[in-house]
Amino acid sequence: MRDRFGFDESSVAGAPYWRKPQLGRRLFFRHLASAVGGYMLMPGQRPMETIARAAVTPKATAKYCIFFMLQSAPSHTDTFDLKPSNGFPAEQFKPTTYNGVLFPQGLMPKLAEQLDSLVLVRSARAWANVHGLMQTWVQIGRNPATPLAKISPHIGSVVSLELTNKSAVLPAFIALNGTPRAASGFLPVANAPFLLTGGAGLPNTAHRDGRERFAARTALLRESEAAGVPTAAELGALPDEIADWKLRSQLLMYNSQVDRIFQLDGDTRTQYGGTPLGDACLTARNLLRSNMGTRFIQITYGSWDHHNNLYPRLTAMAGEFDSALGRLLADLKADGLLDQTLIVAQGEFGRTVGPLNGAAGRDHYQQQSIVFAGARIKGGRAIGVTDERGARTVEPQWSRDRDVRPEDTEATIYSALGIDWTTLKRDARFGRGYEYLPTSEDVYSPVHELWG
């Protein structure tokens, strides 16, 4: 069935979301064997066991990941897959070609200067074009409309589970400038996103009655707990979990190193744009510089929902994004941290192609572009070629020879961070396995072409 652009979704390389890639016989029986074996082994096992189901080699080039959720979906053909035939304001956008990559230098001049660090994946496609559905899909790496999605953790929570250091002061997963669409799911709450809003810094790190009074009350609390706490056999692991939470909270309090992370210098704030997004990017830089335990940062920025008056609104949004990300890339590169950090920026889908709609805007559309940087990827290029309007992929230019889907992006993040994306976690509490990547290898996989 063709849409109003004359495009038949069923012809896309890779099936539409209601007919996702199917399991072959061999993979089906491999998973069946894992499931039966896991079920038989469950009695007497720890609450969560890890099953690696395929021999894969993660890239492991990154220590950190900064994920930009460009909420409500920017127009891909006016930003990272620029299409002159669609009629953007050329004098303002100043389209310029860098090593064969067409880029709107006038719209995003700072990113144009950093293009040698960027890879623009233009062969990406969303499964649907509904905001809430796809924002969640992108952040959990699977269909939110399935029963398992209700307990599915955010990608950042999986990273937290895998990479949290017991000596860390700060949470492994921090969310800036907006609330993620998912939390820790069935994973321990310690892996949930630690939400920070605005540029006011970390709240409640000093007691209102002073440090000495706080220390005295803490000591009194310890004595009270020691006198009346039930035994470990009665409470299981709960006392240890509570003690761990208290310890981590106390490490954040009266900590000058932590305070410095959230003290944003006025001149530097201006260089980042002096906006909430700029403050979030500056905070992300400070978190990475501190090396105090944070491994995954989500920065939310939107709304890009430009159904009307596209070009004035896009110019303002892209300008803020350019100032903040452009400066972040420059600072991380100067610090030697860019090679240790995978940066991913994407919306939940793209925007309609060709002429603007009757309100001078663009509506929801599944084709999109994703920006990658850092982690020693080979920058200054694009992966994937779309048709002259940007409506569909004509050359995927990666090993799967189809569109890049959200699950593939999830696998790419895991691979860069050294995480086996084929992992299955089996939790006795709900008696089933949870795949980091749905149906894993043989269906979805990392875009390793980013590394050349």
Q: Would you name each region that the model predicts?
A:
Residues 1-452:
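Ligand-binding pockets and gating/stacking loops
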